[in-house]
């Protein structure tokens, strides 16, 4: 990894520094952690710690890259024993989940990487996706393997977060079987749905305006809008109450008239972002009754929203590290309604009969990882037509659409 080596005693000290840093980063987050805190836990002077790492970010990067290298080695070592593509993907997912389960604190720290070092996050997922690409390219056109690999990553992304972290439960065989059935078969039980593109629809982002009818509430609206812009641009930790007051053109005292502290502002902002997403999605899906049409339209709505209002999604992601309950509430509220609608589709014989809650988190995860890949990791903030169709075909028909000689059809 390019880091210098030390004597046996030095390596032991370095390991203590790393373990201390994991504990501090986990408890406080990157921005609220310091070299002083880390050194204090180990019982070292600051100057001694700097013999091992240049600064806090260097230490953080080391922890994440070490996690990455060990995960990739473990997956690759276990894949060597299999040739069948279905078995390889199953082993990939099982090993990924087991490794995260064994290293929960580090994985929790890693998820903050997109706010600490976006390149670190991009590199990690590119390397993980490359393993899947190597599995898929034996059977699938190179035009689609990258986007499909990210779709597979998304299929288990929120499963890990919901069950291992938010609910602290096991991801049992039934859940893994549900993930695999979705990955290979998609959601379309009838198998005859043909994805189609929808034009982008206008959305001004002010669907919540009716909630601010009184003059006092309009002041609150201004504060929330200003906070949203600042949190989205600078991040929560780098935004101060005084800046919110200045941009809102109100006094600091007025801010505290409506909110006890900055964290309360964040909670309110996340609540309105949640409603905005649902309102915007409804513009696309309101005229459909077939769940497959709704999914086809809903995913495109999410991609358009990500493209135009990606800063809002960034706020939601960051909120989980500032106030866990707020971030978890956002996703669980979406998943709860999603699960109910998917259950209705299953009962009608339209949607594949698997665990609807698992399916809801898999679908949310696909949207998340594709959104991150196309609008956060890339500089241009666009997703091409072929990629959209590949994602939609994957959602509807799974990898089998591509594995049995099928094409990424565009209708």
Name each region found by the language model.
Residues 1, 130-137, 168-225, 229, ...:
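C-terminal peripheral helix-coil segments that are non-catalytic and often amphipathic
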Residues 16, 20, 24-58, 62, ...:
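Helix-turn-helix
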């Amino acid at each position: 990894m390019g880091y210098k080596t030390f004597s046996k005693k030095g390596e032991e000290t370095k390991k203590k520094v790393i373990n201390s840093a994991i504990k501090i980063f986990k408890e406080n987050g990157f921005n609220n952690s310091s070299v002083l805190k880390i050194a204090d836990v180990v019982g070292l002077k600051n100057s001694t710690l700097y013999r091992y790492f240049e600064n806090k970010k260097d230490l953080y990067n080391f922890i994440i890259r070490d996690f990455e290298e060990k995960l990739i080695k473990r997956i690759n070592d276990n894949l060597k024993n299999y040739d069948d593509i279905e078995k390889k993907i199953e082993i990939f997912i099982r090993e990924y989940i087991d490794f995260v389960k064994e290293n929960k604190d580090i994985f929790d720290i890693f998820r903050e990487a997109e706010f600490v070092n976006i390149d670190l996050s991009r590199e990690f997922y590119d390397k993980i996706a490359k393993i899947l690409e190597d599995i898929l390219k034996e059977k699938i056109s190179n035009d689609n393997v990258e986007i499909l690999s990210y779709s597979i990553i998304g299929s288990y992304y929120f499963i890990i977060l919901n069950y291992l972290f938010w609910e602290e439960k096991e991801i049992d065989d039934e859940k893994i079987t549900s993930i695999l059935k979705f990955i290979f078969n998609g959601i379309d039980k009838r198998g005859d749905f043909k994805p189609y593109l929808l034009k982008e629809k206008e959305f001004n982002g002010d669907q919540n305006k009716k909630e601010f009818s009184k003059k006092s509430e309009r002041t609150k609206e201004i504060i929330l809008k200003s906070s949203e812009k600042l949190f989205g641009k600078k991040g929560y930790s780098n935004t101060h109450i005084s800046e919110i007051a200045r941009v809102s053109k109100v006094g600091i005292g007025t801010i505290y008239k409506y909110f006890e502290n900055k964290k309360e502002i964040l909670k309110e902002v996340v609540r309105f972002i949640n409603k905005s997403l649902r309102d915007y999605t409804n513009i696309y899906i309101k005229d459909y009754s077939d769940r497959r049409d709704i999914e086809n339209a809903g995913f495109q709505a999410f991609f358009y929203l990500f493209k135009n209002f990606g800063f809002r999604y960034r706020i939601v992601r960051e909120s989980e590290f500032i106030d866990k309950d707020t971030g978890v509430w956002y996703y669980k509220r979406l998943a709860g309604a999603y699960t109910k609608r998917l259950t209705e589709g299953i009962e009608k014989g339209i949607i594949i009969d698997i665990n609807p809650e698992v399916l809801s988190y898999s679908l949310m995860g696909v949207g998340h990882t594709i959104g991150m890949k196309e609008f956060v990791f890339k500089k241009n903030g666009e997703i091409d037509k072929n990629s959209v169709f590949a994602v939609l075909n994957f959602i509807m028909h799974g990898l089998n659409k591509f594995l049995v000689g099928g094409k990424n059809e565009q209708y």
